[in-house]
């Protein structure tokens, strides 16, 4: 992949509709395994060549200032179009911004955003299935990297942003399904705080489903 330092400008695609998004996140140990599947439809009268950017956000800590570029923070990322693997054209690094962990949290987290870029075509009047899979290390800072005399253990944090997908058509997804599996945390006696959407939970798996979900 080609690495660049810059920012990505998102362009509205009024004739390309995001029909469905299925997001599955499995949190195991210090890593989150993410599998997201999109059904995208070309409603225009011509074939559309798409340059697609997928953002991944890293929560920055003192440890990651030194090591965030190492492969251990994102050891795996793959794109598939209709089950055929796509080549990552290049990676664009990086935007630095601050964001709250959730709306009730006063703490601001410093984030780094990297964009992974692929090209694909959608024939006129047709739909495609785009899948993105990646493994990312959750943001945290533990006793080995702190300056405290006593060991301290920080929360593991993972953030997923739906907002970039608002540039498809009118920014409304016909169907959005989210599943977050935290069984590994629960069985080890850990606690989980999931915010942003309204979830139901069963045996350590959180579910949320929406129709006509507005990303704007």
Where are these regions (language model features)?
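Surface-exposed, acidic/Ser/Thr-rich flexible loop segments
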Residues: 59-61, 107-195
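Solvent-exposed beta-strand/loop surfaces of large extracellular or lumenal domains
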Residues: 10-12, 62-112, 191-207
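Solvent-exposed, conformationally flexible loop/turn segments
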Residues: 31, 123-127, 203, 213-216
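Short, well-ordered beta-strand segments enriched in hydrophobic/aromatic residues
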Residues: 34-42, 132, 178
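Asparagine-centered strand-capping/turn motif at beta-strand->loop junctions
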Residues: 39-48, 54-60
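N-terminal, polar/Ser/Thr-rich
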Residues: 1-31
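Short acidic/proline- and small/hydrophobic-mixed sequence motifs that coincide with surface turns
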Residues: 45-50, 74, 86, 173
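Beta-strand-rich interaction surfaces with strong enrichment in secreted/lumenal proteins
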Residues: 22-27, 37-41, 105-107, 117-122, ...
């Amino acid at each position: 992949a080609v690495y660049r330092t810059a920012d990505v400008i998102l362009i509205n695609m009024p004739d390309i509709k995001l029909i469905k998004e299925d997001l599955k996140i499995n949190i195991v140990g210090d890593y989150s395994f993410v599998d997201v599947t999109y059904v995208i439809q070309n409603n225009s009268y011509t074939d559309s060549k798409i340059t697609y950017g997928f953002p991944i956000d890293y929560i920055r800590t003192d440890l990651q200032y030194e090591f965030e570029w190492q492969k251990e923070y994102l050891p795996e990322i793959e794109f598939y179009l209709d089950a055929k693997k796509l080549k990552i054209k290049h990676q664009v690094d990086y935007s630095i911004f601050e964001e709250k962990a959730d709306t009730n949290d006063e703490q601001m987290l410093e984030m780094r955003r990297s964009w992974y870029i692929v090209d694909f075509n959608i024939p006129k009047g047709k739909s495609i299935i785009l899948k993105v899979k990646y493994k990312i290390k959750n943001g945290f800072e533990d006793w080995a990297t702190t300056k405290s005399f006593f060991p301290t253990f920080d929360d593991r944090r993972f953030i997923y942003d739906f907002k970039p997908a608002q540039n498809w058509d009118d920014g409304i997804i016909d169907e959005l399904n989210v599943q977050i599996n935290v069984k590994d945390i629960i069985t080890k006696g850990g606690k989980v705080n999931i915010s942003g959407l309204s979830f139901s939970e069963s045996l350590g798996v959180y579910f949320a489903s929406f129709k006509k979900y507005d990303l704007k």
